[in-house]
UniProtKB/Swiss-Prot annotation:
Chain residues that bind Mg(2+) 2: D121, D272
Catalytic activity annotation: N(2)-formyl-N(1)-(5-phospho-beta-D-ribosyl)glycinamide + L-glutamine + ATP + H2O = 2-formamido-N(1)-(5-O-phospho-beta-D-ribosyl)acetamidine + L-glutamate + ADP + phosphate + H(+)
Name of the gene encoding the protein in the UniProt record: purL
Full protein name: Phosphoribosylformylglycinamidine synthase subunit PurL
Protein task: Part of the phosphoribosylformylglycinamidine synthase complex involved in the purines biosynthetic pathway. Catalyzes the ATP-dependent conversion of formylglycinamide ribonucleotide (FGAR) and glutamine to yield formylglycinamidine ribonucleotide (FGAM) and glutamate. The FGAM synthase complex is composed of three subunits. PurQ produces an ammonia molecule by converting glutamine to glutamate. PurL transfers the ammonia molecule to FGAR to form FGAM in an ATP-dependent manner.
């Protein structure tokens, strides 16, 4: 370490660096910048601000390649949330963020405060929150620990969202052993702008007052940002001070107080206190505004006695915000919050010099360059593997010829001379918790509060929310916002680039399946340690795939979150990384919600078609669709292997365009994309959603029948069409294909029936014959059965 007398400190540097998650190189860099050593409080501030959670030091160079501009983009990355222009004077703020590590330690509060934090990102921009979604990952539901994590997380999300009065309208949940002990909790929020001007976070106005509003500051959440930037270990279980405690009723008042304050026009800048608390809010506001901030901790409302400057600055107590307001308007603004029972005090002022100066007990305890804390932060350089890791190459060598033979009867297992018939296989897939109904989860959420939810969870491929006029909430509007979260983590684990492409493509396809036009993306990159060459390779390749897909599908990235070090220390000293999980949150706009389509069949006699990639045997034999990386492969053979198919993005774009045009023209009555589980599971899900049966006749195939039934990939959508519209839609597609020099297929599959049976024939031979009641029971009972049996055992 530095030995000059000018750099003497009154603390053990090595122990302090370990606690703050900093390296010796970081410490030397800090000293060089300051021309002195930092005191212990200042070192803590650098620890949180230079963590991956706050400054993206391992991922920033990769994120810079994302497309971030477009004709509808008003605010991109760098602010609390992205904002898009919806036309007709309406603007939407939206963002996704993670709360993974806190949820692993304290699932209820970790998930609840994750919801509270993402809501603050939205209303800090001047938007009223209108919807929540979540993307969750857990280990298998065969251990009390994983069941407890699921129950705690879902209860926390439900508690906060329900109490604050914002509907949780959609999401996705998947299960894999890699998430055991390290669940993923990603929360997404949407809000409609209520203010004329978008409220930004950059401070300005020398000597303008800085106002603290919201809850009091306590010792909860100490060092949460640093905690979120390291792996989970056994010691983390005792790190409960790093988990915050939220109050949704207080947040409800904060929403109203903020929107009222913003509408006065006297708020110059606003920043919520999330990760790193006061440290992050004041340093980011100063750095973004090119000014400084002086903060007097003696004026900050405290929840506990004898708090140190370190504790004040690193506390992550919830429901707090920092404002810069015009001089002379302090009381006017503060009264907006006091009437809601909230704290509101002037705690500082804007400085001309670009520094963060903190006073505690009448002494200056912090004097740091704002840019060094929040803008000019370190970037870790990693060598990118030139070739895929060896185990990935081995997976890519797999092909379908290694599987047992199949026939009309089912799969023939030679080793024990048994046949698993197609009915049994379908029921097994529908019982997979990742595929099965999530009703046990979403029934705990209030998804109808605010009375704007048009498509609720479990009904359509994306959530759909009515856009009401801000000035007149009683006036109906025909326009709506579609929203979805997606990530095929099994695909990403086997090919991060192709898996990330598929995540964007599927999210966009889901938006299109309800009739909405995809507009923009917010992403949540959940990965393991970037210091592991494989972990960094996965992150880099996934970012490349996301960028490619967003460019082609014209869905710019407006911001998001990076969550690294998602791995669990095992008793044997090894580490268990999660499957790489780049979650894509996407929003879209529909002009007429009355034309929106759901996934369930509508009427007996409607005809069922497969739109997009053909089921022609010649297509089945190419790389567009495959049994590699499928749910079928994992559930029936216990294999997670193969190389996922590559989505043809240009073809995908055209399929979605034709789908949306057909929905808008009322040519299609239902739409459901084919993804997890393949064609037959997609058909089954539409039967379950509607309660109606089907009789389908699929083409005979020379090679593998299971590929026809369960392959994944391609750009494929199941649609149902009234017999009266068959000629019109075929004629429309023919003209579309000619105009675009493309061959989008439209394969007839069968008919919707009212006999309540799920029947599929091959060359007039019935291979699948199940009652809709039977497949529904299997689908609906999967998660509750596992939870109940694990609790009992």
């Amino acid at each position: 370490m530095i030995k000059s007398k000018d750099y003497l400190v009154d603390y053990n540097v090595e122990l302090a660096l370990k606690k703050e998650g900093l390296t010796k190189a970081d410490y030397i860099e800090i000293c060089n910048r300051l021309k002195r050593s930092p005191n212990r409080t200042e070192l803590g501030m650098f620890g949180v601000m230079w963590s991956e959670h706050c400054c993206y030091r391992n991922s920033r160079s990769l994120l810079s390649n994302f497309p971030t501009t477009g004709k509808n983009i008003l605010v991109g990355p760098g602010e609390n949330a992205g904002v898009v222009d919806l036309g007709e004077g309406q603007r939407l703020a939206f963002k996704i963020e993670s709360h993974n590590h806190p949820s692993a330690i304290e699932p209820f509060q970790g998930a609840a405060t994750g919801v509270g934090g993402i809501l603050r990102d939205i209303f800090t921009m001047g938007a009223r929150p209108i919807a929540l979604l979540n993307s969750l990952r857990f280990g298998p539901l065969d251990t009390p620990i994983n069941v407890g994590l699921l129950e705690g997380v879902v209860s926390g999300i439900a508690h906060y969202g329900n109490c604050v009065g914002v509907p949780t309208v959609g999401g996705e949940v998947a299960f894999d052993k890699s998430y055991s002990g390290n669940p993923l909790v990603n929360a997404m929020a949407l809000g409609i702008m209520e203010t004329k001007e978008i409220v930004c976070s950059g401070a300005k106005g020398i000597d303008f007052p800085v106002i603290y509003v919201g809850s009091t500051t306590g010792r909860d959440g100490m060092g949460g940002a640093s905690f979120a930037s390291s792996e989970l270990t056994q010691a983390s279980i005792d790190d409960r001070p790093a988990v915050q405690v939220g109050d949704p009723f207080l947040e409800k008042g904060l929403i109203e107080g903020c929107l009222e304050a913003f509408k006065t026009g006297y708020v110059v800048a606003a920043q919520d206190m999330g990760a790193a608390g006061l440290t992050c809010s004041c340093s980011e506001m100063a750095a973004k505004g090119g000014v400084g901030i002086e903060l007097d901790l003696d004026l900050v409302p405290a929840r506990e006695k004898n708090m140190t400057a370190y504790e004040f600055l690193l506390s992550e107590s919830q429901e707090r915000m920092l404002f810069v307001v015009e001089p002379g308007k302090e009381e006017l603004i503060m009264n907006k919050f006091r009437k809601w029972g909230l704290q509101a005090k002037v705690v500082g002022k804007v400085l001309e010099e670009n520094i963060v100066r903190v006073i505690h007990e009448k002494q200056i305890v912090v004097n740091l360059p704002a840019d060094s804390l929040a803008e000019d932060t370190p970037v870790n350089k990693h060598e990118l593997l030139e070739e895929p890791p060896g185990f990935i190459k081995d997976h890519w060598k797999w092909d379908e010829t290694s599987l047992p033979k199949v026939s009309i009867k089912g799969v023939h297992f030679k080793e024990n001379n048994t046949i698993l018939d197609w009915n049994q296989i379908i029921l097994r897939l529908l019982d997979d918790p990742t595929i099965a109904s999530k009703r046990w989860i979403y029934n705990q959420y209030d998804y109808q509060v605010q009375n704007n939810t048009i498509i609720a969870p479990g009904i359509g491929d994306a959530a759909l929310i009515r856009l009401r006029e801000i000035e007149n909430q009683n006036q109906n509007s025909n326009r709506g916002i579609a929203a979805v979260v997606d990530c095929p983590n099994r695909w990403v684990a086997l090919d991060p680039e192709r898996g990330a492409i598929a995540a964007v493509a599927e999210a966009s396809r889901n938006i299109s399946c309800v009739g909405a036009k995809p507009l923009a993306v917010t992403d949540n990159l959940n990965f393991s340690s970037p210091e592991d060459p494989i972990g960094y390779w996965q992150l880099a390749k996934a970012c490349k795939g996301l960028s490619k897909a967003c460019v082609v599908l014209e869905t710019p990235v407006t911001g998001g979150n990076v969550s690294l070090y998602n791995e669990t220390a095992l008793p044997n000293g090894l580490k268990q990384p999660i499957q790489p999980t780049p979650v894509v949150g996407m929003i879209g706009l529909i002009q007429d919600i009355n034309s929106a389509t759901r996934q369930g069949w509508k009427d007996q006699g409607d005809q069922i078609y497969l739109l997009g990639t053909s089921i022609d045997p010649s297509i089945l034999n190419n790389q567009n669709i495959s049994l590699a990386a499928t749910s079928y492969l994992e559930n029936i053979y216990g294999l997670k292997t193969g190389r996922p198919p590559l989505i043809d993005l240009e073809f995908e774009k055209l399929v979605q365009l034709f789908l949306r045009e057909s929905i808008a023209n009322n040519l299609i009555k239902s739409a459901h994309d084919i993804s997890d589980g393949g064609l037959v599971i997609g058909l089954a899900e539409s039967c379950i959603s509607s309660g109606l049966g089907i009789e389908c006749n699929l083409p005979e195939i020379d090679n593998r029948l299971d590929k026809l039934l369960f392959a994944e990939g391609g750009s494929r959508v199941l649609v149902s069409v009234s017999p009266n519209n068959i000629h019109n839609i075929k004629n429309s597609l023919n003209n579309f294909n000619i105009a675009n020099s493309e061959q989008i297929s439209f394969n007839y599959l069968g008919t919707v029936t009212d006999n309540k049976y799920f029947q599929i024939n091959i060359n007039q031979t019935k291979i699948i014959d199940l009652s809709v009641n039977e497949i529904t029971n299997k689908f609906e009972r999967s998660i509750p059965r596992r939870i109940n049996s694990t609790i009992v055992s």
